Regions:
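Acidic, serine/threonine-rich low-complexity regulatory regions at protein termini
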Residues: 1-110, 114-330
Length: 330
């Protein structure tokens, strides 16, 4: 009698012990499937791919959905990184699933925020909070079912480096001082808010999907810091960075035309953490200003479409230089 039989565990005649991994409702629970958990799927991350996968969705619909999600985050004093995680989950889910119903988008994006809050917040959102902002049209079971659907689609890869992650890393390198604590933020909070407002606005545009997150973060910095210094810090060559910087210029001009707003105060949040809370400007109005101020020259029009050839070059460069980027940031 084999050792497994002596221990009272049947191998089912296959010579292998039974799996004690939880059943997630999948049709298959092969070892290959389990090995892929926590790893990102290979997919084309672009505006064209998303709109092909979701033909019923327009670029403006995506902007409205994410802008509304910012408002939800502000209502519950949710951190900006939590929003950016939710945005990443939402976009990846739309890229992976085909032809989703528009009526399900609110449930999907709220569930993405629910998952993100569990990853990032010390006090995660409750389903009842999300049900309230959705006017109670979704049951608790619907949120739980959707949570499982999204997690399975993403293969539980729910700790990606977001555009905000890259931005904060670059800022830390940029403002680092000798003998300073690397865990403390050294950059001025008011400048940080202006920088993140530009990133917020750009991420609402579906064309932001055509540029890697670190490229977006570096391009945002170029509008506040000398571009040569940004290139030195990020390691991204000018010929790959410049198209995204040009594409982003009308967003920066629109924000300047819109003007700044006083920093919002959240009574439940510590003073030193106030600037990390996701807030919402009237971004849809700013996007309209951005459209009206965008140059119509051929070069600007190509940048406005985030010329896929150029951004594909940036994506390819990223794949081969990822280790170099991290070395530069150390």
């Amino acid at each position: 009698m084999g050792e497994s039989s002596q221990a009272g565990v049947s191998t089912g005649g296959s010579g292998r012990l039974p799996s004690f991994q939880p059943y997630l409702g999948c049709e298959s629970s092969d070892d290959d499937d389990w090995r892929m958990i926590g790893r990102p799927r290979n997919m084309r991350r672009s505006s064209v791919s998303l709109l092909e996968q979701q033909p019923k969705m327009t670029p403006r619909m995506r902007s409205v959905i994410l802008c509304w999600l910012m408002e939800v985050c502000e209502t519950y004093a949710i951190h900006r990184q939590t929003f950016y995680l939710a945005q990443d989950y939402f976009d990846r889910f739309l890229l992976l699933e085909k032809n989703l119903k528009l009526g399900a988008m609110q449930l999907i994006v709220l569930t993405c925020l629910l998952i993100a809050s569990k990853m990032e917040e010390t006090r995660p959102l409750k389903i009842r909070h999300l049900s309230y902002v959705a006017n109670g049209i979704y049951l608790v079971e619907e949120f739980r079912d959707m949570e499982l659907v999204i997690l399975k689609a993403l293969r539980w890869y729910i700790r990606p480096d977001t555009a905000l992650t890259w931005l904060k890393s670059f800022l830390q390198v940029l403002t680092a001082e000798d003998n300073s604590d690397p865990m403390e933020q050294q950059f001025p909070k008011d400048i940080y808010i202006k920088i993140t407002n530009l990133l917020d606005l750009c991420i609402l545009d579906v064309n932001s999907l055509d540029t890697p997150y670190h490229g977006l973060a570096a391009s945002v910095l170029c509008h506040f810091v000398d571009q040569e210094l940004v290139q030195q810090i990020t390691g991204v060559p000018k010929d790959l960075l410049q198209p995204c910087v040009d594409w982003m210029l009308p967003f920066m001009e629109a924000l300047e035309e819109f003007g700044s707003e006083p920093q919002k105060h959240f009574p439940t949040i510590k003073k030193e953490d106030q600037h990390n809370i996701q807030t919402k400007l009237d971004y849809m109005t700013v996007l309209c200003l951005q459209s009206s101020t965008r140059c119509v020259s051929q070069k600007r029009c190509e940048s406005a479409r985030c010329g896929l050839v150029q951004t594909e070059d940036l994506c390819a460069w990223t794949r081969t230089h990822t280790s170099r980027i991290f070395l530069l940031m150390q």
